[in-house]
C-alpha cells in the first residue's frame, strides 16, 4: 500500500535528519546518561546524550500524519490511484500510548539527569504513570464503537485471533475491569521488556524495527484478507487494520532512521523516553490486531532478556546464588568476554528467528482455516 510505504519512508527520513541536531541540543544542555557503577564496560558511555526516544516519537507522528496528507492530495488530484485509509481511532489510541508512555519515560530520564544518578522515577511512580495511560487507552479501545458497533478491541483474549477465553463471562462491567487489568499487564510487560533490553548500542532499536515491521505485515494482511474485502472462513474482523499498518510502518521507519545514530558506537541513547513508549506501542498494536499472545513470540528477544532478570532475582532470593554473572542477559555476555557488537548482532539474529516463527504461525493459522 502506498500510504504504508510513505509513512515508513517519511518517518525514517525525519529521524535520520533530525537526530543529529537533537544530539547537538542535548550536548549543549549537558543532558547525558548516567551508568550503573557495576557496568564497568559502559563507563565510557557516561554522559552520552539520552532521551533519543523523543526523536522516534516525533518522527513517527510526522510520518503517520504526513502520509495521510500526501495520499489525500494524490487522491484528490487524480495523480495516482491509491487505497486510502482515513485517520482511525485505533491508530490514534496507539499514538496515545506511544506519546503517553513517552512522557513517563521523559520524566524518568529527566529525573536521572537532574539528580545525577542512574535511577530516575521510582517503580511506583512509573507504574502509576503506565496505569493511568493504559486505563484511558483500554476504555477507548473497548467502549468507542463505529457505525457498525465494532470497537477497536475485543474482550476476548487473543493469540493469532480471538480465542474462546472471553473476559465478558461475568457481565459487561466485570469485562471492562478485567480488560483494563489485562491491558495493563500486556502494556507494562512490553514497555518494561523493551526498557530492560535497551542496554547495548542499537540492541533494542534494531529489534524494535523488526517487530514493528512484522506488525506492518500482519495488519496489512488482515486488511487484504478482511471480512469486508475477502469474505470467507479465514477472513479477519479487525477494525482499522490498514491504518494500523500505516502507523506500525511509521514507528518502525522512525526506529530505522534513529538506528543510524544509535548503532555502535552510539552517538545518542533512546532512554526510557523511547523504550517505554515503543514497548507500549507494540502492546497496543497486539491488542488492536487481536494478536495479544503472538507478541510473546514476535517479541521473543524482549521476553528472553526480561526472563533473565526474573530468573536472577528468584534464584538469588531462594538460594543466595546468581544464575548469571550479572543481569540482564546481554550484560552477562559482556562479563563473559563477548564484544558489544557481537552480542548485538547475535541478539538481532535471535530477534529475527522469533519474528520468522511468529509470522509463520500467523500464516499457518490462516492456511488451516482456508
Residue ranges: model-predicted function:
Residues 1-29, 58-106, 110, 134-162, ...:
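Alpha-helical transmembrane segments
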Residues 22-44:
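Juxtamembrane linker/hinge segments adjacent to transmembrane helices in membrane proteins
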Residues 36-49, 116-129, 335:
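Juxtamembrane helix-capping/reentrant segments at transmembrane boundaries
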Residues 112-122, 159-167, 339:
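Membrane interface segments of multi-pass transport proteins and intramembrane proteases
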Amino acid at each position: 500500500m502506498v500510504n504504508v510505504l510513505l509513512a515508513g519512508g517519511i518517518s525514517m527520513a525525519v529521524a535520520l535528519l533530525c537526530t543529529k541536531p537533537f544530539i547537538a541540543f542535548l550536548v549543549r544542555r549537558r543532558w547525558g546518561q548516567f551508568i550503573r557503577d557495576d557496568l564497568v564496560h559502559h563507563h565510557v558511555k557516561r554522559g552520552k546524550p539520552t532521551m533519543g526516544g523523543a526523536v522516534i516519537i516525533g518522527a513517527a507522528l510526522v510520518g503517520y500524519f504526513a502520509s495521510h496528507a500526501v495520499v489525500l492530495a494524490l487522491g484528490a488530484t487524480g495523480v495516482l490511484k491509491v487505497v486510502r485509509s482515513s485517520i482511525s481511532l485505533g491508530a490514534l489510541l496507539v499514538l496515545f500510548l506511544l506519546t503517553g508512555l513517552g512522557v513517563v519515560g521523559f520524566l524518568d530520564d529527566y529525573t536521572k539527569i537532574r539528580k545525577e544518578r542512574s535511577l530516575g522515577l521510582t517503580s511506583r511512580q512509573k507504574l502509576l504513570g503506565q496505569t493511568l495511560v493504559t486505563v484511558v487507552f483500554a476504555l477507548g479501545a473497548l467502549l468507542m464503537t463505529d457505525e457498525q458497533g465494532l470497537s477497536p478491541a475485543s474482550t476476548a483474549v487473543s493469540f493469532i485471533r480471538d480465542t474462546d477465553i472471553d473476559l465478558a463471562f461475568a457481565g459487561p462491567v466485570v469485562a471492562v475491569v478485567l480488560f483494563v487489568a489485562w491491558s495493563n499487564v500486556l502494556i507494562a510487560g512490553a514497555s518494561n521488556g523493551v526498557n530492560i533490553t535497551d542496554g547495548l548500542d542499537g540492541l533494542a532499536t534494531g529489534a524494535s524495527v523488526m517487530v514493528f515491521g512484522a506488525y506492518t505485515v500482519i495488519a496489512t494482511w488482515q486488511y487484504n484478507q478482511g471480512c469486508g474485502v475477502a469474505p470467507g472462513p479465514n477472513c479477519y474482523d479487525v477494525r482499522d487494520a490498514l491504518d494500523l499498518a500505516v502507523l506500525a510502518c511509521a514507528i518502525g521507519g522512525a526506529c530505522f532512521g534513529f538506528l543510524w545514530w544509535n548503532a555502535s558506537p552510539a552517538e545518542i541513547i533512546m532512554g526510557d523516553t523511547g523504550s517505554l513508549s515503543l514497548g507500549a506501542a507494540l502492546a497496543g498494536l497486539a491488542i488492536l490486531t487481536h494478536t495479544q499472545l503472538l507478541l510473546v513470540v514476535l517479541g521473543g528477544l524482549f521476553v528472553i532478556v526480561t526472563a533473565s532478570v526474573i530468573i536472577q532475582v528468584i534464584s538469588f532470593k531462594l538460594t543466595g546464588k546468581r544464575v548469571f554473572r550479572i543481569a540482564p542477559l546481554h550484560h552477562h555476555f559482556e562479563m563473559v568476554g563477548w564484544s558489544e557488537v557481537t552480542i548485538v548482532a547475535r541478539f538481532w539474529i535471535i530477534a529475527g528467528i522469533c519474528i520468522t516463527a511468529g509470522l509463520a504461525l500467523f500464516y499457518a493459522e490462516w492456511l488451516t482455516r482456508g
